[in-house]
Amino acid sequence: MTKAVLTSISQLALKALLYEVSLSPKPGLVDRFDNGAHDDMSFMTFIDSMIALSPFFQAYIETGFAYAKEEPLLLFNRLRQLGQKAEETMFCATQGINTHKGLNFSMALLLGATGAYLARTPHLMTDLGCFSKEDTLAICRLVKPMTAHLIQADLGHLNTKKEFTYGEQLFVTYGIKGPRGEASEGFTTLTNHALPYFRQMISQNDPETSQLRLLVYLMSIVEDGNLIHRGGIEAWKGVKADMRLLLQQDLSTTDLRLALSSYNQCLINQHLSPGGAADLLALTFYFAFLEKLL
C-alpha cells in the first residue's frame, strides 16, 4: 500500500515534466512545435531525459519517507547522492546535453520532502484527495532546514577555484543563487507567487489557458539564471518587461498563442531561453496535481 502511494506521487512528478515540455508555444524553450533557442536538444531529447530520471523520482520520495526522522542535513546528503546518480544517468541518456539538471535538483528535494511529510501525516497516505495548499506549503518549508547550509557550502569558497560551472559563474558575476537559493529559502517563489497565481487562473479559465498564462507570469517575475547566462542582466530585464506588458493585455487564448509564437521567434533570434521559468512551471504542475487543480 505504502509503496503504491509513493509510486503514484512520483509519477505525478514525471507527469509535471511531461506537461511542461508539452505546453506550446513556449518562447525560447523546447516544446511540441520547435526547439526554441536550443540547437542541441529537441522534444525527443527531453523524453529521453525524463525516462532516465523517472526511477530516481521514486527513489527520492521513498528515501524521504524512510528517513523522515533523520536530521535534515543527513536526509539532504542522501538525496544529493541519489540526485548525482540521476544526473549521470540523464547525461548518458541525452549524450551529455543538460535538459533537467536544475530541475532534477529541485525535484530531489521536493520529492524527498514530500516523502518525509507523508510519513508524518499518515492520513494523507489513505486519502490523497484531501491534499491541500497548506500541505504544499508544509512540504516546501521542510526543504529549508535541509538546505540552510547550501549557499555557504557550495558557493562560499569560489575564490579558490579557477574554473566554474555556469551556475557558479552566475553567482560570482551577478550574485544569482539559482536553484540552490530557491531551495534554501523554502521555494518561496513557488509558494508565494507561482501557485497562488495558478490557483486563481485555474478557477477562472480552462487548463491550457491557465498554463500559458502561468508561463507568462513566471517569465515576468523569475530571477532566471538561464536568461542571464545567455544574454546578461539587461536581456533578462527586457524579457520580464515584455511579459508584464503581455499579461496586462489580457488576451484570449487564441491571441495569447499567437503572441507567444511571435515572441518565440524574437527570443530565438537573440538566443535566449527562460529555463528558470520552465523549471518553476514544472514544479507548479507537480503541486497542482497533488492539490487536484489539474
Swiss-Prot record:
Organism expressing this protein natively: Streptococcus pyogenes serotype M18 (strain MGAS8232)
Family, as annotated: Belongs to the CitG/MdcB family.
Chain's gene name: citG
HAMAP family: CitG (MF_00397)
EC category name: transferase
E.C. numbers: 2.4.2.52
InterPro entries given in the database record: CitG, TriPribosyl-deP-CoA_syn_CitG
Nucleotide-binding listed as a keyword: yes
Short name of one Pfam family: CitG
Organism superkingdom: Bacteria
GO biological process: one example: prosthetic group biosynthetic process
Protein name, per record: Probable 2-(5''-triphosphoribosyl)-3'-dephosphocoenzyme-A synthase
Record keywords, A-Z: ATP-binding, Nucleotide-binding, Transferase
Catalytic activity line of the entry: 3'-dephospho-CoA + ATP = 2'-(5''-triphospho-alpha-D-ribosyl)-3'-dephospho-CoA + adenine
Keyword field contains S-adenosyl-L-methionine: no
GO MF annotation terms: ATP binding; triphosphoribosyl-dephospho-CoA synthase activity
